């Protein structure tokens, strides 16, 4: 039995989960998420819990069981608590600022880099060098944060670049002179 898949998902009182076959809609105080999950899985919904049940013990069903449960749990957590990723800009003159809902990064290029806020994503800039990406979809928040980091990933010699908060950047020693 999948250790992740057999866990029962607790649903907070302010969140509603509705199933239409394999299509799931989760509504909560932070927003609403929809997704089509694996059609082979069945869902047992009771008052405050949902259990994902797999049809057989085949290898494919065992792997999909845990994945389906994790996706559904992430949706429930997203609409109730939300997700947030924090990025730090490290480097002389590196800064971020808001322009409406969009994010503008000055990270050593000849031009500022503009990142559009997708629907359901909000940016917050603190102290010009810290960017917070938040939203209800864990997948979307992670993808946007990764796109921001890829604008100027941290380099190993001086450590300059955009990094996740708490990310360890392995440093290298420079060339030694003759």
UniProtKB/Swiss-Prot annotation:
<dbReference type="InterPro" id="IPR036789">
    <property type="entry name" value="Ribosomal_uL6-like_a/b-dom_sf"/>
</dbReference>
<comment type="function">
    <text>This protein binds to the 23S rRNA, and is important in its secondary structure. It is located near the subunit interface in the base of the L7/L12 stalk, and near the tRNA binding site of the peptidyltransferase center.</text>
</comment>
<keyword id="KW-0689">Ribosomal protein</keyword>
<dbReference type="InterPro" id="IPR020040">
    <property type="entry name" value="Ribosomal_uL6_a/b-dom"/>
</dbReference>
<dbReference type="GO" id="GO:0022625">
    <property type="term" value="C:cytosolic large ribosomal subunit"/>
</dbReference>
<dbReference type="InterPro" id="IPR019906">
    <property type="entry name" value="Ribosomal_uL6_bac-type"/>
</dbReference>
<dbReference type="InterPro" id="IPR000702">
    <property type="entry name" value="Ribosomal_uL6-like"/>
</dbReference>
<dbReference type="GO" id="GO:0002181">
    <property type="term" value="P:cytoplasmic translation"/>
</dbReference>
<dbReference type="GO" id="GO:0003735">
    <property type="term" value="F:structural constituent of ribosome"/>
</dbReference>
<keyword id="KW-0687">Ribonucleoprotein</keyword>
<dbReference type="GO" id="GO:0019843">
    <property type="term" value="F:rRNA binding"/>
</dbReference>
<comment type="similarity">
    <text>Belongs to the universal ribosomal protein uL6 family.</text>
</comment>
<dbReference type="InterPro" id="IPR002358">
    <property type="entry name" value="Ribosomal_uL6_CS"/>
</dbReference>
<dbReference type="Pfam" id="PF00347">
    <property type="entry name" value="Ribosomal_L6"/>
</dbReference>
<keyword id="KW-0694">RNA-binding</keyword>
<keyword id="KW-0699">rRNA-binding</keyword>
<protein>
    <recommendedName>
        <fullName>Large ribosomal subunit protein uL6</fullName>
    </recommendedName>
</protein>
<comment type="subunit">
    <text>Part of the 50S ribosomal subunit.</text>
</comment>
């Amino acid at each position: 039995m999948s250790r992740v898949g057999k866990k029962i998902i607790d649903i907070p009182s302010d969140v509603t989960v509705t199933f239409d076959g394999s299509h799931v809609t989760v509504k909560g105080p932070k927003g609403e998420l929809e997704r089509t999950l694996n059609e082979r899985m069945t869902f047992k919904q009771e008052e405050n819990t949902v259990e994902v049940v797999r049809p057989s013990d085949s290898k494919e069903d065992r792997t999909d069981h845990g994945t389906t449960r994790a996706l559904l749990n992430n949706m429930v957590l997203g609409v109730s608590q939300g997700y947030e990723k924090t990025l730090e800009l490290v480097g002389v003159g590196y800064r971020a600022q808001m322009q409406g809902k969009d994010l503008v990064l000055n990270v050593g290029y000849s031009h500022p880099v503009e990142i559009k806020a997708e629907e359901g994503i909000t940016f917050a800039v603190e102290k010009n060098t810290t960017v917070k990406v938040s939203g209800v979809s864990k997948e979307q928040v992670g993808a946007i944060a990764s796109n921001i980091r890829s604008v100027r990933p941290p380099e190993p010699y001086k450590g300059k670049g955009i990094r996740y908060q708490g990310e360890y950047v392995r440093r290298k020693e420079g060339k030694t002179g003759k």
